Regions:
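Thiol-based oxidoreductase modules, predominantly thioredoxin-like and allied folds used
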Residues: 117-164, 191-210
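Short, thiol/selenol-centered motifs that function as redox-active sites or metal-ligating centers
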Residues: 99-110, 155-180
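Bacterial N-terminal signal peptides that target proteins for export
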Residues: 1-9
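Short, surface-exposed basic-aromatic patches at helix termini and helix-loop junctions that form
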Residues: 88, 176-188, 209-212, 225
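Non-globular targeting/processing and membrane-anchoring segments
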Residues: 25-149, 231-362
Length: 362
């Protein structure tokens, strides 16, 4: 118990710099920190305003303005248009397994969700009080963030090894800095940030509460869009293979928010493996709508009597890094595919990408 309390206090301290004011007079907020990291001006009177005169931040802001502007034009605006036409009745919850910190595409595909549940192996990490970084520390931190995000800004997915190197042991580490950036660049306002832990029954615990053994750690971010409606983003660091998924409380927690809609992309074809059958079965049982590329759940696992399939794009098979994952029934299904004007997944070029919209007709 004493050992856990020390861990819990340390976990809570990680978020102090961003979830609540650092100095009562300064009013440093998570939202201002997110905007600063995203290359966007913080609110008037923020202690971070002084740092925006730093040439490294100004270069960073120009870089992100250009990168996100291109991404918006090339993909995100087109995904939102596709969603508006093809998703008739979205659920309040969306599940995004193997996501990394990719809130950007979760929001683009499911802008009307009110609860977003993201999960991956990477830890949440921390965001320190940026005003207290040593001289030159801000520029180095911003550069590492840019490097860690280069693949998703260019290709729509994270390269996990690169992200670990760039956001491993530095001032900014884990997924939280990137979640902040994506929230800010998606036009969201962060209202609250807290560490969260799940016990093995799926119950959520905060602050110094003891979740017991087999805990699953994460972060809960409460935010609002331009309409002011409050929403919640959960990110959990968890192993989704059977040996872990069956003893942790993560899927039990997800079940309390089900049914939901699900997104699967660039998932290393893990859901093709028998070692990930637990999460695969959860998604099939608790998803009203599934959007996936071919790295998601193989067609053979869908009950053809319960699901209706709407293929988009072109199925060109897996990339060379994933041999043996070709699906002949995908080839047959995609003979009737509708066109789409954006790229997604490992085959990120628009004329090579595939997307399968599956609707549970139960």
């Amino acid at each position: 118990m004493r050992h856990f309390n020390k861990i819990a206090v340390a976990a809570a301290a990680i978020f102090v710099a961003t979830a609540s004011p650092v100095h009562a007079a300064d009013k440093l907020t998570a939202d201002d920190t997110a905007r600063f990291l995203a290359g966007m001006p913080p609110s008037a009177g923020s202690p971070l305003t002084a740092l925006t005169s730093d040439p490294s931040w100004q270069r960073h802001a120009r870089f992100f303005d250009a990168a996100f502007g291109q991404l918006e034009q090339r993909q995100l605006s087109r995904i939102r248009a596709w969603t508006g036409v093809n998703l008739a009745a979205p659920k309040p919850t969306m599940f995004y397994m193997f996501s990394g910190p990719d809130f950007l595409y979760a929001d683009a595909f499911f802008p009307n969700a009110t609860s977003y549940v993201l999960s991956a192996l990477e830890p949440p990490g921390s965001v320190p009080d940026l005003t207290r970084l040593p001289r030159g520390g801000v520029g180095a931190a911003l550069y590492n963030v840019e490097r860690s995000m280069s693949s998703i800004l260019s290709f729509s997915f994270f390269i996990t090894k690169s992200m670990k190197l760039d956001l491993g042991d530095g001032q900014l580490n884990g997924t939280l800095p990137i979640l902040y950036i994506f929230l800010a660049r998606s036009g969201k306002t962060i209202r609250d940030v807290n560490p969260i832990a799940l016990d093995d029954k799926g119950a959520a615990h905060f602050a110094n509460e003891n979740p017991g053994r087999n805990l699953t750690r994460g972060v809960r971010i409460v935010f609002a869009g331009s309409d002011g409606r409050e929403k919640t983003l959960y990110y959990f660091s968890t192993d989704l293979s059977n040996s872990s998924a069956r003893v942790s409380g993560f899927l039990k927690f997800c079940e309390t928010l089900a049914p939901g809609d699900s997104l699967i992309k660039s998932a290393s074809y893990l859901l093709h493996s028998p070692n990930f059958s637990a999460v695969r079965e959860f998604l099939l049982a608790h998803s009203a709508t599934m959007i996936q590329d071919d790295s998601g759940i193989p067609l053979a696992f869908y009950d053809q009597r319960r699901w209706r399939f709407f293929p988009f794009g072109r199925y060109a098979g897996p990339i060379a890094e994933f041999p043996g994952r070709y699906q002949p029934n995908y080839t047959e299904l995609f003979k009737r595919a509708q066109p789409m004007d954006f790229g997604i997944g490992y085959r990120w070029r628009a004329h090579e990408s595939n997307l399968l919209l599956s609707i549970n007709a139960r």
